[in-house]
Regions:
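Short internal beta-strands
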Residues: 63-69, 238-243, 383-384, 407-414
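N-terminal leader/targeting and accessory segments in enzymes
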Residues: 1-95, 277-280, 300, 304, ...
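Glycine/threonine-rich flexible loop motifs
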Residues: 48-52, 186, 208-215, 391-394, ...
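ATP-dependent carboxylate-amine ligase
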Residues: 1-15, 36-39, 317-327, 331-341, ...
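Phosphate-binding loop of NTP-binding sites
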Residues: 8, 87-241, 249-259, 313, ...
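Short glycine-rich anion-binding loops that position phosphate/pyrophosphate groups of nucleotides
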Residues: 45-46, 71, 181-182, 204-205, ...
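Short gly/ser/thr-rich secondary-structure transition/capping motifs
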Residues: 18-27, 89-92, 155-158, 177-183, ...
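Acidic, Mg2+-coordinating active-site environments of NTP-dependent enzymes
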Residues: 71-76, 196-354, 432-438, 442-445
Length: 503
């Protein structure tokens, strides 16, 4: 609860019509969520203009309106005019919720792939060290073990600040948060003061939005500018960068080392602050050694694959900057199980391996396929597709990658949205066929219906084979042109295994 006059001091105002000595009980930019005593922010989006919903907001009890265009005045409702309502929101909302990010250690993780796993690993390490953590990310938000739904990798400003306020109220000490490039460019994290940031990697994705990889990298680098900006200090500030990534220098250049400590991690550069080597893999685990400050430590984790060693290194770095000892971190890694939909094993007693993974980018797909090569004696069967209304350039690229590594490539639908599923599948399959011309042993199947594609893969698999079902991971829905239906790759794989009963 804040006085409107207090809120107005946080942002530039053009003029005010009505009383400012009024209590504001809530803040929202969604007219459907207005309740008695709310402040309603009229945001202009790509498809919706909040100024058109002022009447609805007033009817539901809004006591104040923030607008950048003239709106109809209503008796008893204050109208505040600003040049930019989005900027006003970024200024006012963190203040309304008492700047919750200042009350907790804020750990941010960014990169194309690996954010979710790294975030959950950091949280697990901190919990094992005795802290109470909050998690905000692609799958969900967590306060301890309590799960809260989220709609974006990084929630919008109001939802995010409300969530952080709730975490602070519940005495969370550390927040582990995935930060997307979209959220950085769009200012969703503008009011958040970060203490610790990790860069996992940067590979082709979201180019429908960023247009070029350089723009994409600059968007990610905003986080490292933020973590090294002078704010309400809560102790040390740190940045951890995967120097094996070609865009590492962009992140490193963004760090002001007078404010934040810059650290590196690597699996190829022995001079990095954290260097992993002597790695060994099985289908269900990884073991490796890490050097840090002249000492060598042994690590064992149930996370399979080389890419998960990178994820673990990022998490180790973040935990070290929170004052956790290497011994505590190594012990915690032994008890970390997995993240839903991230190289998740589906076991119904079958003789072959089935894995569901969120890999939906060229790099992500290549990483799970190379991991499959490392741990599999038999064939690799991959079920994959590309999302509709998204970057079309990656479709043939992903087809080529799947064909290069797999023995059986099954192209199918993956959230076609408003596009024709068959058109998307053809564009992906074109990349597969390019490789097949040079790799005649490759078996190619085009099965537009995703359920049937999963069933096909299971029916073809034999002992020692691995079936990779890529693209959706934890998602339990399929987005079609006119509706969203329940669909979970893990459920479908289990059903197909039970129906085949070839154990």
């Amino acid at each position: 609860m804040k006085k409107l006059a207090e809120l107005l001091k946080t942002t530039p105002i053009l003029r005010t019509e009505g009383a400012t000595d009024i209590e504001i009980l809530d803040v929202t930019a969604d007219s459907r969520q207005v309740k008695e005593g709310s402040l309603f922010l009229c945001l202009e989006g790509a498809h919706v203009d909040g100024h058109k919903f002022v009447d609805s907001a007033v009817k539901l009890g809004a006591k104040a309106i923030v607008a950048s265009k003239e709106v109809k005045a209503t008796e008893g409702v204050t109208v505040v005019y600003v040049a930019d309502t989005r900027k006003a929101m970024e200024d006012m909302v963190p203040f309304f919720f008492d700047y919750p990010s200042r009350k907790m250690r804020m750990i941010a993780l960014t990169g194309t792939n690996g954010k979710t796993t790294t975030t959950h690993v950091v949280s697990h390490i901190l919990e094992q060290a005795g802290y109470k953590t909050g998690v905000i990310g692609t799958i969900h938000a967590l306060i301890g073990d309590k799960e809260l739904p989220t709609h974006n990798t990084t929630p919008d400003v109001i939802d995010l600040e409300r969530l952080l306020w709730q975490m602070a109220e519940e005495k969370v000490t550390h927040v582990c948060m995935e930060v997307s490039s979209h959220s950085l460019v769009m200012g969703r994290v503008e009011g958040v003061e970060f203490d610790n940031a990790v860069f996992t990697n940067l590979t082709e994705d979201h180019l429908d939005y960023h247009k070029t990889m350089d723009n994409y990298a600059k968007a990610k680098a905003i986080l490292f500018e933020k973590v090294s900006s002078v704010g309400q200090t809560k102790g040390n500030k740190a940045a951890w960068v995967n120097v094996d990534d070609p865009y590492a220098h962009v992140m490193m250049d963004a760090v002001d080392q007078k404010v934040a400590d810059l650290h590196t991690y690597s699996m190829s550069d022995k001079t990095a602050d954290l260097y992993a080597f002597d790695s060994r893999f099985t289908g269900k685990s990884s073991a490796f050694k890490v050097t840090y400050e002249g000492k060598t430590y042994q690590f064992e984790t149930r996370l399979a694959g080389r890419f998960n060693i990178y994820n673990t290194l990022g998490a180790i770095g973040a935990a070290l900057s929170e004052g956790i000892s290497m011994e505590t971190i190594a012990a915690a890694m032994k008890t970390f199980h997995s993240v839903p939909g991230r190289f998740e094993l589906i076991d119904e007693g079958q003789s072959f391996t089935v894995v569901v993974d969120y890999a939906h980018t060229p790099d992500g797909l290549e990483k799970i396929l190379t991991t499959a090569q490392e741990i599999t004696k038999g064939r690799i069967l991959v079920v994959f597709g590309c999302g509709g209304d998204r970057d079309k350039m990656k479709r043939p690229i992903m087809g080529r990658i799947a064909a290069r590594y797999a023995d059986v490539a099954i192209v199918t639908s993956d959230n076609p949205r408003t596009e024709d599923p068959e058109t998307i599948v053809k564009e992906v399959a074109a990349g597969v066929e390019e490789v097949k011309a040079e790799k005649p042993s490759l078996q190619v199947e085009v099965v537009v219906d995703r359920r049937s594609a999963i069933q096909k893969a299971i029916s073809l698999a034999k002992g020692d084979d691995i079936v990779l079902i890529a693209g959706k991971g934890h998602e339990d829905y399929q987005i079609l042109k006119d509706k969203t239906i329940h669909f979970d790759d893990r459920e479908e794989a289990r059903k197909a295994l039970k129906q085949s009963a070839r154990f």
